[in-house]
């Protein structure tokens, strides 16, 4: 994920991030299934999706902690 995309994610609301997180988890499931059946064309996509999931979870957690401080 590029820095520009990361800034866009940080500026979006938690509901949108949760929806995006669900979409990425579904995509990761499909990619793993394709890997197991030998149909996966781009194995690097798994790494990219996992990294995006981690970044979104981090953003959600940061917002949660920020809300607790206030």
Swiss-Prot record:
One Pfam family name from the record?
Ribosomal_L29
Q: Name one GO cellular component term.
A: cytosolic large ribosomal subunit
> A single GO BP annotation from the record?
translation
Q: Which GO terms describe its molecular function?
A: structural constituent of ribosome
Keywords, in A-Z order: Ribonucleoprotein, Ribosomal protein
PANTHER family according to UniProt: 60S RIBOSOMAL PROTEIN L35/50S RIBOSOMAL PROTEIN L29, LARGE RIBOSOMAL SUBUNIT PROTEIN UL29C
What family does the Swiss-Prot or TrEMBL record give for this protein?
A: Belongs to the universal ribosomal protein uL29 family.
Task: Name it.
Answer: Large ribosomal subunit protein uL29
Please tell me the species this chain comes from: Clostridium beijerinckii (strain ATCC 51743 / NCIMB 8052) (Clostridium acetobutylicum)
Give the classification, highest ranks.
Bacteria, Bacillati, Bacillota, Clostridia, Eubacteriales
Q: Which gene encodes it?
A: rpmC
């Amino acid at each position: 994920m590029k820095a520009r995309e990361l800034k866009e994610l940080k500026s979006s609301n938690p509901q949108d991030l949760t929806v995006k997180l669900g979409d990425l988890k579904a995509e990761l499931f499909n990619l793993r299934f394709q890997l197991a059946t030998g149909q996966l064309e781009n194995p690097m996509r798994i790494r990219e999706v996992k990294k995006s999931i981690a970044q979104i979870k981090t953003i959600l957690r940061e917002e949660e902690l920020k809300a607790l401080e206030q």
